[in-house]
Amino acid sequence: MTDIGKKHKLLREEFFNQLAFLLSELEWGKDLYKKAEEKCNFSENYHYILFSEGDAQIIEGFEEWQDQKMLELLIKEEPKLKIREKIFKALEARIISIVPKSVILQQNALFLSPCNLFLGAKCYSRTCDLIWRYAGDKSDDFNYYSKRGLLLGVYISARLFYLSDDSKEFIKTKEFIATSLESIIKVAKIKTKIKLPSIEDIPILRLML
């Protein structure tokens, strides 16, 4: 990475730090970017230099910034936790500990817009992949997709549940995450008992061998 590239990376992180607070008051758009520039002491419209690909780059970059913050928090956790415990800690950190609830609300609303559905799916899928990798998953077969697909459902539903949770220290959200993880583990156990057909078991494919 060039010196300019390193400089821009640091400035983007500073920009995202401001977004994490400003999104509690402002919606996504030019007013938000302008306010973030002011807070960062950037020149007017400097975000066009940092994010030459436009809004999508800012939105996706902000999600990646939150993912990185999640991983930084998880470094402090006990390394010998079980896989389920690691996933629980990761979901708890990502949903509750990174940005205010009002920011989660803004992001959920943003990704529900038809023009942002694909971007939302991409960002959420990336988060779930990082969580599985943090938990130690190294699968590269069908299980790779099924694990991430199941976790994606838990992640999205937990984000929505969190928005209406007014319990002390969001204990109900934590219970919801734990219960949801238990459910997908049961599904995973059932799946392992089901023998999927191999190529040799499918007549039309067997002829091609």
Task: Describe every region a protein language model picked out.
Residues T2, K7-E44, E53-E64:
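Short, amphipathic alpha-helix enriched in basic
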Residues K9, E72-I104:
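Hydrophobic alpha-helical connector segments
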Residues I83-S97, C123, T127-Y134, S180:
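C-terminal ligand-sensing/allosteric alpha-helical core of TetR-family HTH transcriptional regulators
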Residues S97-F118, K122:
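Amphipathic alpha-helical segments used for helix-helix packing
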Residues C115-D137, R148-L152:
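Amphipathic alpha-helical packing segments from all-alpha helical-bundle domains
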Residues S139-L152, F170-T173:
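All-alpha amphipathic helical-bundle segments outside canonical DNA-binding/catalytic cores
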Residues Y155-K168, S183-K191:
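Amphipathic C-terminal alpha-helical segment
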Residues K189-L209:
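Long, charge-rich low-complexity segments
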